[in-house]
């Protein structure tokens, strides 16, 4: 019988799929108890799954390896989503009130919901980073409780091709692996893990150099301000080095 005692996560990248499982300690840290990986090059390119059958087989193999090391079943896994089509787009939603009123949480929630419903062609909104709210002529990060008649929410939407999310979900469904909660945006999850609060507040850029892609994030005042994925990674450098008549294995080491 599957148990929820363990916390498990799976990361999908162009070079490999990694799975990890453990238990949460009393101090909040995670004690790693199992790890497994599979080559992803036969079914992932630029961070996107293109062969669902092979991806499902690899996911099944990883879960089996993790459960074998744990000597127990895994109920759900946390999954991060990334890939070349991942990027940010700006959007604004405005409301005019009948008279000056105190901005409520309900109104802010309605504005956020309207932002998520913005029509996109072949794209899906994966997550949203609220930037600030303009109430009358003043900008606020926390709008609830502020008096005003005009409010505009400014948002940074993290979007990706609809097929990116669809193929990932189909792969997990075929492997009969249940995803815990919503999909995590892998680059922002990484940023929360490696950047300090001071770094994100004062302003910094995080560059994640992968096999097929390079992801760039910019933070300022503890808010994500920019995210983009470049279609270049370590494999491009390796291929350039092999043109100097060097074996790929040696080029990879360099």
Task: Say what each PLM segment does.
Residues 251-254:
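Small-residue helix-packing motif on alpha-helices
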Residues 202-243:
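Glycine-rich phosphate-binding loop of actin/hexokinase-like ATP-binding domains
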Residues 1-16, 20-205, 223-225, 234, ...:
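Nucleotide/phosphate-binding catalytic cleft detector across ATP-hydrolyzing
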């Amino acid at each position: 019988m599957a148990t929820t005692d363990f916390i498990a996560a799976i990361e999908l990248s162009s070079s490999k799929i990694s799975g990890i499982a453990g238990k949460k300690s009393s101090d909040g840290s995670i004690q790693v108890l199992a790890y497994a990986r599979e080559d992803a090059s036969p079914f992932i390119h630029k961070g996107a799954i293109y062969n669902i059958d092979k991806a499902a087989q690899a996911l099944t193999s990883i879960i089996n390896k993790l459960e074998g090391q744990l000597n127990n079943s895994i109920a759900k896994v946390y999954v991060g989503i990334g890939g070349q089509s991942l990027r940010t787009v700006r959007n604004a939603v405005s409301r005019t009130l009948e008279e000056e009123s105190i901005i409520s949480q309900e109104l802010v929630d309605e504005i956020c919901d309207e932002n998520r419903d913005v029509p996109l062609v072949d794209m899906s909104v994966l997550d949203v980073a609220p930037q600030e709210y303009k109430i009358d002529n003043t900008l606020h990060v926390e709008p609830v409780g502020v008096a005003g008649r005009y409010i505009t929410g400014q948002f940074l939407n993290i979007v990706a091709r609809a097929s990116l999310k669809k193929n990932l979900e189909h792969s997990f469904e075929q492997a009969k692996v249940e995803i815990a909660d919503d999909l995590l945006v892998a680059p922002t999850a990484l940023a929360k893990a490696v950047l300090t609060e001071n770094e994100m507040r004062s302003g910094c850029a995080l560059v994640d150099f992968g096999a097929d892609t390079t992801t760039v994030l910019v933070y300022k005042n503890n808010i994500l301000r920019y995210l983009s994925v470049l279609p270049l990674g370590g494999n491009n450098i390796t291929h350039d080095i092999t043109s100097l008549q060097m074996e790929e294995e040696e080029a990879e080491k360099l």
